[in-house]
Amino acid sequence: MAMMAVDDEYTSKTKEAGQRVKDHLLNGGLSNVSYHYQGSVMTDTHIKGHSDIDLLVICNKFYTYDAQNVQQILANNINFSNFQLSKLRTIVGRESYQGNSLEDLRTIRLESENILFWKYDICDLTHPKAIKITNQNLHRDVDIVAASWYDDVDSILNDQKIPYRGIQVYDKVANNISTPDYPFLSIDRINERSANTGGRLKRMIRFLKNVKVDSKNSIGISSFDINAICYNIAPYNYNNLHYLALVEVVYNQLYKIVYDESYANRIVSVDGKEYIFKGNNKRVEIKKLYQDVFTIYSILKTQNLL
């Protein structure tokens, strides 16, 4: 069924494609970087033919942090312990990076391009934020993304441990960095909640992804949005349900998003950093997805499977 995980062999080849890119960059002499993966493969919510793997190449020379909020907290000293405040003061007191951070990121991007261009017949260098290669032996795509570390208050208070750290992606055309993303926090949260619910969260995510790609309509929502839609369903609503019954749970969630704007506006991303539906037209797209799920739900009801 559309909720099932992709088979281990398929997933293994996807990860191997990412590892081969990493090995090429390591052997090519790229320095002062660390490598991390992001995306649906890391949560086992990927679907066949529609999911690649992202290899993050993160500069280790510098990081940035949320100076505005840190300074505000230190000025007001409200709701934080002395121990927490000392961590924030330590960050502020560190010597600032004296190099050119954008030039460092540009070097990572261009050196990565030079290494990979000679390793892959299909190597697309035109995208501002990613190098896109195809491993023709494994039949897998890999996106290679240059980025830097970003620490908000939560990350600093958690000792800049990777699950809490954000990243800022480098754009070679604009020669700047994006607003922070928190892929590792999202990965950890999805994996943890799904483990605590017997894999049901991931089944719902896969189900919606498959409905989207199989739809006759073009549905303009991302995996990021689908993750949030499912993650925001309270676990007590599905924790002990049979897997087929998850269709009704997802149907009810989409119904509320489509017909209750106030409810939709409260849905936040898995990392808790942004609202998914507030101030945009995504609910129009969700209605298309809802209609497809309603069709499946109705069939299951007619067949007395729900």
Named regions from a protein language model:
Residues 55, 68-70, 159:
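Residue-level signature of transmembrane alpha-helix interfaces in integral membrane proteins
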Residues 20, 259-306:
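Terminal (often C-terminal) interaction modules
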Residues 33-34, 129-131, 226, 265-268:
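Residue-level recognition of the N-termini of beta-strands and the immediately preceding loop/turn
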Residues 42-60, 134-145:
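Histidine-centered divalent-metal-coordination microenvironment in nucleic-acid enzymes
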Residues 1-36, 40-50, 61-95, 305-306:
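N-terminal regions immediately upstream of nucleotidyltransferase
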Residues 13-19, 88-260, 301-304:
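Catalytic cores of NTP-dependent nucleotidyl/adenyl transfer enzymes across multiple folds
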Residues 4-9, 95-100, 192, 277-284:
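Short coil/turn segments at secondary-structure junctions
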